[in-house]
């Protein structure tokens, strides 16, 4: 079966594993998914990311992060730009998520960036997802 939206699949896998408090999960790899996972790690939403080569497309292993009392670090994940309705933002219209408590992930001409990085570099692009 052909997957029409691999980014939504990745976010759903993370959301589902987070809801049942799994320690780790595996996602089929792609370059864009790898960059999104690196952003989530850099911003402190996940604990670690491993990239496993398997002579096919590879696997991304994501280690989820929880607080002291096993509370979730990721409260929500939302796919914004979908295959049926693409959402773009100009450099001066980059969205803020929960007044800066969350992040927006954008695909720009300068690579995959968070909303803060896109504002600093004055780059617009496709709004992939919100994470808070």
UniProtKB/Swiss-Prot annotation:
InterPro entries, sorted: Ribosomal_uS8, Ribosomal_uS8_CS, Ribosomal_uS8_sf
GO biological process: translation
Sorted UniProt keywords: Ribonucleoprotein, Ribosomal protein, RNA-binding, rRNA-binding
A single Gene Ontology CC term: ribosome
GO MF: rRNA binding; structural constituent of ribosome
Gene3D superfamilies (alphabetical): 3.30.1370.30, 3.30.1490.10
Highest rank taxon of the organism: Bacteria
SUPFAM superfamilies for the chain: Ribosomal protein S8
Signal peptide per UniProt: none
Record function comment: One of the primary rRNA binding proteins, it binds directly to 16S rRNA central domain where it helps coordinate assembly of the platform of the 30S subunit.
Protein name: Small ribosomal subunit protein uS8
Species this chain originates from: Bacillus licheniformis (strain ATCC 14580 / DSM 13 / JCM 2505 / CCUG 7422 / NBRC 12200 / NCIMB 9375 / NCTC 10341 / NRRL NRS-1264 / Gibson 46)
Source species taxonomy: Bacteria, Bacillati, Bacillota, Bacilli, Bacillales
Gene: rpsH
